[in-house]
């Protein structure tokens, strides 16, 4: 059974560490090497793999130093993006074995064009595509691509744990409540999030089931969500609703 820990980095990043029972581990999106090296030393762990979702520096900045510290480490990442010291390029449909567990690679363009995610046994590492109560900004792709990527994630089993790369939950919930002020699950989640953050406890991972109740970007067919953007759209199809929500969030 794999154990997953969060290593905080920068102001709001999480570097996810995946550990097996014999002190071998992998990390996901190490934007900074030092907190990883400190954690590995403190817990006497050996780094065997680095998984990257996309090329932004706060996700790959620590890769070169980690490779220097662990020269035999495998660096897995998107085939279509410039990842330093990449050894194992991946794209949609590829599979990765990690400590006896198989992870399927999902192509998740939108935030960046080559963004990928890794889905294993009831767990998803999705970088900057899906956040709790929110989604990533569209820097390189199109709204249509981002909508399709989120739809791909939404089709996964609802018990899937979602390991996002940023602690954006509180600000995302504030926007979600602007969209759906009468959503009781969302109000309760706001209170839960505030309690956790007051204690400096991560709000992540989340679950896909929870996100379908509280995340407006996964609720684009909900009548209240559609109504909230009625003055911003000509068509009420889900992709148009998503696009309007994302534009609204950019201004929020």
From Swiss-Prot:
InterPro entries: Clx_II_MBL, Glyoxalase_II_hydrolase, HAGH_C, Hydroxyacylglutathione_Hdrlase, Metallo-B-lactamas, RibonucZ/Hydroxyglut_hydro
Binding site for Zn(2+) 2: 58-59, 128, 166
Keyword Flavoprotein: no
The keyword Transmembrane appears for this protein: no
Pathway: Secondary metabolite metabolism; methylglyoxal degradation; (R)-lactate from methylglyoxal: step 2/2
Family affiliation: Belongs to the metallo-beta-lactamase superfamily. Glyoxalase II family.
GO BP annotation list: methylglyoxal catabolic process to D-lactate via S-lactoyl-glutathione
Entry-linked SMART domains: Lactamase_B (SM00849)
Enzyme Commission number(s) of this protein: 3.1.2.6
Binding site for Zn(2+) 1: 54, 56, 111, 128
Keywords: Hydrolase, Metal-binding, Zinc
Names of required cofactors: Zn(2+)
Disulfide bonds, paired cysteine numbers: none
Note on how the cofactor is bound: Binds 2 Zn(2+) ions per subunit.
Reaction catalyzed: an S-(2-hydroxyacyl)glutathione + H2O = a 2-hydroxy carboxylate + glutathione + H(+)
Quaternary structure annotation from Swiss-Prot or TrEMBL: Monomer.
Molecular function as annotated in GO: hydroxyacylglutathione hydrolase activity; metal ion binding
SUPFAM superfamilies: Metallo-hydrolase/oxidoreductase
Function: Thiolesterase that catalyzes the hydrolysis of S-D-lactoyl-glutathione to form glutathione and D-lactic acid.
Record protein name field: Hydroxyacylglutathione hydrolase
